[in-house]
Amino acid sequence: MTRSASKVARTPRAFVRLVSHDETRADWTLPVIDEVKRLGCHWACSHREARRPRSISDGDIIFMARIVDHPHNILVYGRALAMKHVTGRDSATGADIELRPWKAEWPCYIRLRHPEFVDGTIADGVPLFAMMDELAEKTFTSTKRNAKNGNGNIDPKRAYWHQPSMELTPDATKWLSARLEHAFVQHGRISRRTLALLDWPEGWGPLSR
């Protein structure tokens, strides 16, 4: 058996990511397409320089979410496949910052492939608190590990507080994927034609591999 053939294929991990660059809370009636345009999350998630995203690998799943208020919750409205961060390549350009000035403080990218978004409002997304209530410590890899070890925080709502992203357990990935698929069936996906009209880096697009 060759060395390459003997390697065990890596199972993609899944993360839920608060895509917004600020801590403001959205209204439930915010159209998803407006959030996508504002953040540019059709092709990248942005991170601060001090928190350069080293843990994300090619093919990992990124579920995109936004904090909402009245009532308070976190709603997942889209997903995409990640590309591993490469220093230099995945940094905001002057043109990027001119278009979205906040990227001066959030210049590090995780590029995204095959984005899918609910074609509706943020309210049509999947409420993350429902998953946390049902799965409890089995929501995140960190809380599941803490429960197994008998120490540390096992409350998923506390674990997520002020964290830009959290790794999901396989159970949580399955739970969230099923309900997001249901949201796509109910409300549709934002079309590739619509996404193609948004700003894209040169050589990049909604069908990029």
Language-model-derived ranges and their functions:
Residues R66-H72:
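Short, charged beta-turn/beta-strand-edge "cap" motif at the junction between a beta-strand
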Residues M1-D58, H70, M166-R209:
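Compositionally biased, charged N-terminal/linker segments
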Residues N73-Y77, L81-P170:
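Aromatic- and Lys/Arg-enriched surface recognition patch
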Residues D58-D60, C108:
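Short beta-strand or tight-loop elements
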